[in-house]
Amino acid sequence: MIEITKRTISFFKNLTFIKQIDKDTVSDSNNSRFEFIQKEETLAVEMPVALVYNGISHTVMMATPSNLEDFALGFSLAEGVIDRVSDIYGIDVEETCNGVEVQVELATRCFVRLKDLRRTLTGRTGCGICGSEQLEQVTKKLAKLDRTFCFELKKLDGCLALLQQAQTLGKQTGSTHAVGFFSPQGELLAIREDVGRHVALDKLLGWHAKQGKPQGFVLTTSRASYEMVQKTASCGIEMLIAISAATDLAVRMAEECNLTLIGFAREGRATVYTEKVRLKI
């Protein structure tokens, strides 16, 4: 297992992931008229999370304030800010009056490179393209992925069930995305949830890196956008499965880097877009 050196993590007890509110719900009580019924609802917390590298703010994402160490690490790897886990010397999570700051201490080499590639963005819910200064950064070239394992498609139904069962936040709120990492045998190794699909994936990629990048694949409750493909492939993961559809750019990018891309994953069916050589029927 790879660990961050000089790790400095501080979390606040009042940094919560869900909130309880009273709200009026309209329901058809007797099939003839609607009425307001007051009930308690559980909401997922969404707040600005700023990533600050060596004291300089780099990006602000709207996110759920959980697993923020994983988020910082995964984002840094997927965006090319760092090359390896050891490029981060410390992570400190600080609550502010407006949100959360994740202070990341970078190796000097990476910080110099970051200043050259600087982009400052204020994402909507997990939007990772907003604010890019150069269009080329959006469609950056990815290395070809190796083909190191084969997955039996008959195990996909079980994976979908495991991901559904493990969505603690999603079950409580109904408003979050979930991303799970599975072994080639279909074992659920980790799950991360967030109001933003890209942020949820960043959190999972951070976990994946800390574990030494084990073999396996990603299963997400969202669609497969080009950025989901880009982030997954850039971290060396060979397969991405989405419950919803893929976009055309996502498919083209998956073809270019040899990533197995699957969409519309449902019980008993799925759409294979690319690289079916990793699949066994």
UniProtKB/Swiss-Prot annotation:
Main location: cytoplasm
GO biological process: Mo-molybdopterin cofactor biosynthetic process
Top-level division of the source organism's lineage: Bacteria
Species of the source: Mannheimia succiniciproducens (strain KCTC 0769BP / MBEL55E)
Gene this chain is encoded by: fdhD
Name of the protein this chain belongs to: Sulfur carrier protein FdhD
Disulphide bridges: none
UniProt family annotation: Belongs to the FdhD family.
Function: Required for formate dehydrogenase (FDH) activity. Acts as a sulfur carrier protein that transfers sulfur from IscS to the molybdenum cofactor prior to its insertion into FDH.
Active site residues according to the UniProt entry: C127 (cysteine persulfide intermediate)
